[in-house]
């Protein structure tokens, strides 16, 4: 992404970001070269069209543990607030459903799961549609137990 000049610095948040339109053009061009592709990242709903997608797996994680991770990465408070709020509200899930439709979405809480467990659950969901679930994760109800998170998302 950096080599292709798709990345810029968001000075307000103190982080790198990408030019969505440029990334979309590059990704669509690259996708034509392959039959099967796995794309990771929260930007999929903004870079892909429904016809390019067979299945979307939305990985969720407890905001409490995300907060810890973001602090370890030295994210700015603005970036932490943006990411935590997005997870609490389920923005990536919402945008994925809106873009690709519920039938193409699987959602997993990865908070206490190992990579091996997540892969096992994914394979089960691929083989058995009854294991495909969305909308079961509710971080809002956990906020009252985490004062630091509550303060963080209160404006």
Show the residue positions of the predicted features.
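Short, hinge-like loop/turn segments at secondary-structure boundaries
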Residues: 9-14, 56-58, 98
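Conserved acidic residues
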Residues: 35-36, 54, 105
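ATP-dependent NMP and nucleoside kinases share a basic, alpha-helical "lid"
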Residues: 41-79
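NTP-dependent small-molecule kinase module
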Residues: 97-155
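Flexible phosphate-sensing "switch/lid" loops adjacent to ATP/NTP-binding sites
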Residues: 2-22, 78-84, 116-131
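Small/polar loops that bind or transfer phosphate-bearing groups
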Residues: 40, 58-59, 84, 109-110
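ATP-dependent small-molecule kinase phosphotransfer cores
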Residues: 1-48, 144
